[in-house]
Amino acid sequence: MNSRTKIIGSMCIIGTTVCYGLIPSLSFLSFDAGVATETLLFNKFFYAAVLMWAYIFIKKIPFRMDAGAAKMMLVISVSYIGVATTLYISFNYISGSLATIVSFTFPAMVIAIEMITGMEPVRIMKIAAVILSLLGLALIVWTPDIKGNITGIFFAFLTAVCYVGYIMGLASKRMKKENSIAVAGYVLLSSAVFNCIRCALSGEPMFAAGKVQIIYMFLLAVICAFTAILLYCIGVRMIGPGNAAIINTFEPVLACIFGYFIIGDVLTRNMITGGIFVVAAVFIANLPSKGIGLKPGA
């Protein structure tokens, strides 16, 4: 890997991390503008899916899968729908910064499952990552100012659980040969269909109305979904999934910074300390690994 390739690849992953870090703040700005959760998710995934599939067809990226891969793709899609749904439910109770921190306990969960099942050997650094993640989560949960928001923390934790299913599905042998952009296209499409049904059942409008709402939907779909995924795929090809995962560790940090400056999120001492523990755990978890696959932002 030459220095130019490394710099460009790293910049792509940094761009992805910034895009993902903006998701909570832009989502809350959308809520303030009067966009319902169901409408937001449908618009975000629908427009991103249109762009992604246009890219797939223009670039002639292979997207057909055999029966085995198609079944695993269904598991991955359902898991990701769970990620987006539970994360946005948590937004009803806690800040986007806090929800992002809690959801980032998923790498420690993956490590724990891999060690318990024998998929990965037991290593001190891996155990340290799990312990740090649990300590960070405990500090966040025990923050005095958020005792009334255990429901939000619970749903953010469910987001992490769904991420585990999603990540392990991506890492399965059946999906190794599939193009990551095609996989992202299916994930976005299935999420759009699911939230279209949610809009129909809830009575919420499928499309945002008004200039401000449309701008926020455009930013979430084009920047936080389509561009973020595309940059991630390009970056991974250039610097490898391991290096990409390490850079992506800083997503919850950026989410907190953006939340604080853009929408005025409150950051308590326990939240900051717990967040540092979680970020450290993710960093340790990814340092010796080969990466955890594609992670389209929720």
Feature names for model-found ranges:
Residues 1-39, 43, 86, 145-172, ...:
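Glycine-/small-residue-enriched transmembrane alpha-helix faces in small-molecule transporters
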Residues 11, 42-43, 99-105, 170-192, ...:
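Helix-helix packing/entry segments at the starts of transmembrane helices
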Residues 19, 24, 53-103, 139, ...:
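Specific transmembrane alpha-helical segments of multi-pass solute transporters/efflux pumps
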Residues 30, 40, 44, 90, ...:
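Hydrophobic/aromatic residues within transmembrane alpha-helices
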